[in-house]
């Protein structure tokens, strides 16, 4: 069974002893050193580091969009676009009267369902707990899932929400943005949906461009194009 995972940066000693260095690690004397930012794993006699490039690192109170992977009798496991998985306790959904014997989790959330949730607890040494107990959280019943780089999320939101507000007002779309880089777009109009998706993709691909807001606005203002 694998040892507990831990967050490492280049130069960190992952472990010492008779282990075989594998992905993103090197052997220096009897020390196995990480060569990248990532999560270390020790399995049997080998050591590796899973790189975090492009992946989301959870932070407490972050809003995330998760996809249900599976469930036990006590919780759901969510894919949150991270090297970590999110765990949603059944009691968070069923309430205080939840009974593992009487309540069936699949009646609330099934594999493949999307949920908007918040990171409730996380310390890098274990997978995070997520919660849907706040207002506007829970199962997402409609919309198209998009993925952008988590590092581009602040650009998509914009200063005081200016970018996403502009996109929503121009397309009549409703956009839910997860800090993990997953975005759900809902719109009754097919044209509005396509235009909103195009705007979001522009932000993802051109976040470094100085006049990006003007370019997105120009695209949104064009009639009959998507």
UniProtKB/Swiss-Prot annotation:
Keywords: Cytoplasm, Exosome, RNA-binding
Domain S1 motif: 61-135
InterPro entries: Exosome_RNA_bind1/RRP40/RRP4, KH_dom, KH_dom_type_1, KH_dom_type_1_sf, NA-bd_OB-fold, Rrp4, RRP4_N, RRP4_S1
CDD domains cross-referenced by the UniProt entry: KH-I_Rrp4_prokar, S1_Rrp4
GO cellular component, one term: exosome (RNase complex)
A Gene Ontology molecular function term of the record: RNA binding
A GO BP entry: exonucleolytic trimming to generate mature 3'-end of 5.8S rRNA from tricistronic rRNA transcript (SSU-rRNA, 5.8S rRNA, LSU-rRNA)
Subcellular location: Cytoplasm
Limits of the KH domain: 141-200
Main location: cytoplasm
Highest rank taxon of the organism: Archaea
Pfam families found in the cross-reference section: ECR1_N_2, KH_1
Record-linked SMART domains: KH, S1
Family: Belongs to the RRP4 family.
Quaternary context: Component of the archaeal exosome complex. Forms a trimer of Rrp4 and/or Csl4 subunits. The trimer associates with a hexameric ring-like arrangement composed of 3 Rrp41-Rrp42 heterodimers.
Functional description taken from the UniProt entry: Non-catalytic component of the exosome, which is a complex involved in RNA degradation. Increases the RNA binding and the efficiency of RNA degradation. Confers strong poly(A) specificity to the exosome.
Protein name as catalogued: Exosome complex component Rrp4
């Amino acid at each position: 069974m694998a040892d507990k995972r831990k967050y490492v940066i280049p130069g960190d000693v992952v472990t010492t002893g008779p282990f075989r260095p594998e992905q993103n690690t090197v052997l220096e004397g009897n020390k196995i050193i990480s060569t990248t930012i990532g999560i270390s794993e020790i399995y049997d006699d080998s050591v590796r580091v899973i790189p975090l490039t492009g992946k989301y690192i959870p932070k407490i109170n972050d809003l995330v969009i998760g996809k249900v992977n599976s469930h036990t009798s006590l919780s759901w496991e969510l894919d949150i676009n991270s090297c970590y998985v999110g765990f949603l306790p059944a009691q968070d959904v069923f309430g205080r009267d939840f009974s593992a014997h009487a309540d069936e989790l699949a009646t609330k959330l099934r594999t493949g369902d999307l949920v908007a949730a918040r990171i409730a607890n996380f310390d890098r040494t274990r997978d995070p707990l997520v919660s849907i107990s706040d207002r506007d959280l829970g199962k997402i019943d409609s919309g198209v899932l998009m993925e952008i780089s988590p590092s581009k999320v602040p650009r998509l939101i914009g200063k005081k929400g200016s970018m996403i507000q502009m996109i929503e007002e121009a397309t009549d779309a409703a956009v839910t943005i997860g800090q993990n880089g997953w975005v759900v777009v809902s719109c009754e109009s097919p044209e509005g949906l396509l235009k909103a998706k195009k705007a979001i993709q522009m932000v993802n691909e051109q976040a470094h461009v100085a006049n990006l807001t003007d370019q997105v606005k120009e695209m949104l203002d064009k009639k009959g194009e998507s």
